[in-house]
């Protein structure tokens, strides 16, 4: 039986890490795409040369033409530019919107049946634009945000309590930015909700609040430490978890930037919510009841995403007709 083809659009730090993880997990054959000649070919060859050591048989190729992604079952998009000092939000939106339009056209032509995972920032606006540009069903196009944000929250909690990360469950909703909503009430250690752990004396509310703030600023913390780049290991692992749930029909419940059409009171926008991912894509949106501060924070997050989407509509009004 032929292996699944997994196309990675963008061969930077995340793209290269994704390719290596696909090989290590033997999820399929990899096509690394990039507009920079030689870069995807070089990275693909480097990773392929590690296969005898790591013991995987996935085939890796690099390409500069969208033709190479033909028939891909999964497409993961990291193409675009990061925000640089002095660059306004609209500058970043304008540049990466053009990239999403080009990528969307390539996917539409060569991989119209794929499950598409977008990682490009600003995430919630870019995944919206990518779905419009590709014309793929909304349930087959998602953004990678919540899995990463929740993983950071889980790691910080496990570190605080000195327990295994495997025993910590945590959910982060909303946009992928500083308005994200880490849900303390729905986060647990071995099934014990965090508020109960505060009562049990495992931690204090003030300490929990600090961890929530650190989660919101998790990406910025790494950027400030690296100084010349941003996170790529954890984002790549997060996208692979989503792809694996689709490819293996695992039906995992994971928070992703999903297209909402009335759920949570949101219409035609991509916002981070828990979903079930199976071989049909997003098979169910899990609608958690939000109240009080959580509801306020979620609404504020949605408003921030709405602002980004409105800016996209002004920059690229032709997307609306798609």
Curated annotation (Swiss-Prot):
GO biological process: lactate metabolic process; tricarboxylic acid cycle
Coiled-coil annotated spans: none
Pfam family, one: Ldh_1_C
Keywords, sorted A to Z: NAD, Oxidoreductase, Tricarboxylic acid cycle
Positions bound to NAD(+): 10-15, 34, 96, 119-121
Task performed by this protein: Catalyzes the reversible oxidation of malate to oxaloacetate.
UniProt-recorded name of the protein: Malate dehydrogenase
Gene: mdh
């Amino acid at each position: 039986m032929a292996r699944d083809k997994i196309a990675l659009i963008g061969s930077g730090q995340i793209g290269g890490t994704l390719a290596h993880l696909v090989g290590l997990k033997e999820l399929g054959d990899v096509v690394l795409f990039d507009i920079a000649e030689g870069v995807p070919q070089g990275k693909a060859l480097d990773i392929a040369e590690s296969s005898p050591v790591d013991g995987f048989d996935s085939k890796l190729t690099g390409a500069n033409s969208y033709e190479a992604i033909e028939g891909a079952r999964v497409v993961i998009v990291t193409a675009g530019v990061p925000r640089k000092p002095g660059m306004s939000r609209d500058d970043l939106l304008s540049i990466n919107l053009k990239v999403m339009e080009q990528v969307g056209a390539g996917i539409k032509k060569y991989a119209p049946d794929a499950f598409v995972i977008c990682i490009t920032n600003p995430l919630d606006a870019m995944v919206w634009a990518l779905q419009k540009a590709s014309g793929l069903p909304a349930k087959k196009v998602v953004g990678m945000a919540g899995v990463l944000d929740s993983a950071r929250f889980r790691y910080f909690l496990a570190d605080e309590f000195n327990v295994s990360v495997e025993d910590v469950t945590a959910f982060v909703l909303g946009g992928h930015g500083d308005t994200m909503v880490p849900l303390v009430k729905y986060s647990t250690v071995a099934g014990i909700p965090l508020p109960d752990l505060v009562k049990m004396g495992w931690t204090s509310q003030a300490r929990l609040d600090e961890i929530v703030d650190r989660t919101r600023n998790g990406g910025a913390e790494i950027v400030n430490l690296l100084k010349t780049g941003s996170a790529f290991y954890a984002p790549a692992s997060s996208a692979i978890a989503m792809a694996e749930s689709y490819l293996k029909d695992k039906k995992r419940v994971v928070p992703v930037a999903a297209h909402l059409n009335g759920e949570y009171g949101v219409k035609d926008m991509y916002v981070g919510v828990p979903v079930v991912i199976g071989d049909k894509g997003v098979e169910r949106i899990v609608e958690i009841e939000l109240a009080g501060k959580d509801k306020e924070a979620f609404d504020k997050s949605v408003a921030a995403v709405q602002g980004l989407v409105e800016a996209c509509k002004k920059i690229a009004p032709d997307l609306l007709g798609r």
